[in-house]
Amino acid sequence: MDNIRDEIIQNVKEKFEADSNVIGLVLAGSSFNNSGINKNSDIDFVVVTISPGGQFEFYHDKGIWVEIFYEDEERIKKCFEDNDEIMINCFKDGRILIDNKGLLGELKKSAMDIVEDYEISDYNLKRLKYRLQVILLKIKNAYLKKDLDKLIFLCMYVFPHLIRGLYIINHKIPPTLGLWYDRDRILKLEGGDLLVNLFEAIKNSSSKQDIDEIYNIFMQLNNLLDSKTGGAFKGWKDKRKEHFQTFL
C-alpha cells in the first residue's frame, strides 16, 4: 500500500504543482485499479486539500487513493452517475462543493463547518446501522459479565459511529477532519447530552460500580439512534427514499 500511496502522491504533485489554484478531487476505495473506483469496494468519505504553492494534505478513514480529477462539473456529475455510492468533497479558500448521488451544489461553508440539511445516502446509513448492531451484542455481553475494561473499550471503539449517528439524525453532515469529539457542537445536537455524559462516565470510571451508568447511557443513545433511523428518514426530501425500506 505504501508504494501505491507514494505513486499517487507523486501523481498529485505532477498535476497540481503546475497550477496551485486547481481544486483537488479524490475518490477512494478499498481496491486500487487503473480504471478508477471499484463499485463493490468499501468507500469512505475522503478529501484532499490543495493550498497555494501546491502543498497538499490527505485525510481519510480507510482506503487508498485511486484517481484524481481537476474541478470539472460535468465530469463530477458523470462520476456520480457511474458510481452510485461515492461522495465527493472538494474545496478551496473556504468554498466547499459537496455532492451526493449526482445532485451537485455549492455550499458557502468552510471545510470545518457543519452542513445543514444533509441528506445521508441509504448506503452510508445502512453501514452505520450495521456497525452499531454488531457492537451492541458485544457490549451487552461485556455488561452481563461485568467486564468494565471491555465495556469501556467497546464504547470507545464505537464512539466515532455514535457521533456520526447523532449528526445524521440531526440532518447534519458528520465531521471528517479530526473533529470527532467537539463537545460544544455535540451538545447542540439532539442526543448530544447523552454522548457527552457517556464520555464523562467513561473518563471518570474507577470501579465496577460504574458499569451500570456507562451501560445505561449507551443504551439510551443506541435506542435514540435506532428509533430515529427507523422512521425519521422517511420524511426526508430524498427522491430515492423508497430504497430505505430495504433495511428500516
Summary of predicted features, one role per range:
Residues 38-40, 80-81, 178-180:
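Short aromatic-enriched loop/helix-cap "lid" or pocket-rim segments at secondary-structure transitions
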Residues 4-7, 56-147:
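Conserved NTP/Mg2+-binding pocket subregion across the NTase superfamily
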Residues 13, 55, 163:
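Generic structural marker for isolated residues within well-ordered, non-membrane alpha-helices
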Residues 118-248:
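Conserved nucleotidyltransferase catalytic core and NTase-mimicking acidic/glycine-rich helix/loop elements
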Residues 1-24:
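Helical scaffold of the NTase/Pol beta-like nucleotidyltransferase catalytic core
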Residues 26-71:
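Catalytic metal-binding acidic patch
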Residues 6-12, 33-34, 97-105, 144, ...:
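Short N-terminal helix-initiation segments at or just after the protein's N-terminus
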